[in-house]
Design a protein with these regions (language model features):
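Acidic, metal/ion-coordinating pockets
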Residues: 1-206
Length: 206
């Protein structure tokens, strides 16, 4: 327990965790995280090896470090059931942090430009997510997005090269109007591709 996140929160407070990069986040236009875990008091966990949760107050770790938004479309957003997911959304809302993912898209106004973001959880369905990619990008366009960023939770852990599903969905996203594709889940860096003039970062690591 002494080396756990909980112990460090109790000992050092919410400001401890991003202290070395907070100044960077404060200077940028938009800071987005992929949040793998839940902010909930639920106790019935999913049947899986790793399940993550924390109290709602832990949202202050993000809000106090200039994090504006969180992608929740990943394999840990429902670790303690459906309510843990909605609890997380509520906790982030209360902390002033926008969230998006699955069928929930978000528009931010950054220096007068409407930036649209969406999160796609690819791991279970692979190419079946294509229709959601199209639908979400269409929704962002309809909402007036001038720049569209698509976050994919995809790929294989500890693999340094993207697989064919990643490549196909990334290309589809850009063909449909995305300006930037960002990937996560492998926990390691994967390649960056320039496709039709737009960048695809297949995995940002951790």
């Amino acid at each position: 327990y002494s080396t756990s996140l909980n112990a460090y929160y109790e000992s050092y407070g919410a400001d401890y965790f991003f202290q070395n990069v907070r100044s960077i986040f404060q200077k940028d236009d938009l800071s987005i995280v992929n949040m793998e875990g839940t902010l909930t008091d639920e106790t019935a966990r999913e049947a899986k090896t790793f399940a993550f949760k924390a109290p709602a107050k832990y949202a202050a770790i993000l809000s106090g470090s200039s994090i504006e938004a969180a992608n929740l479309a990943n394999n840990h957003s429902h670790d303690y059931g459906k309510k843990s997911y909605t609890d997380t959304i509520s906790a982030l809302d209360d902390a002033g942090i926008a969230s998006f993912g699955y069928n929930r898209v978000k528009i931010f106004k950054v220096k007068g430009i409407k930036v649209g973001v969406t999160g796609i959880y690819e791991l279970a369905d692979h190419q079946k997510r294509a229709s959601q990619v199209k639908k979400n990008i269409k929704a962002l366009k309809k909402a007036g997005a001038q720049i569209i960023i698509v976050n994919f939770h995809w790929g294989i852990e500890k693999q340094y090269t993207p697989d064919e599903n990643q490549k196909a969905l990334a290309h589809l996203a850009i063909d449909e109007g995305a300006d930037l594709v960002i990937g996560h889940h492998p926990h390691v860096l994967e390649s960056i591709e320039k496709y039709n003039g737009k960048y695809i970062c297949y995995s940002l690591g951790n």
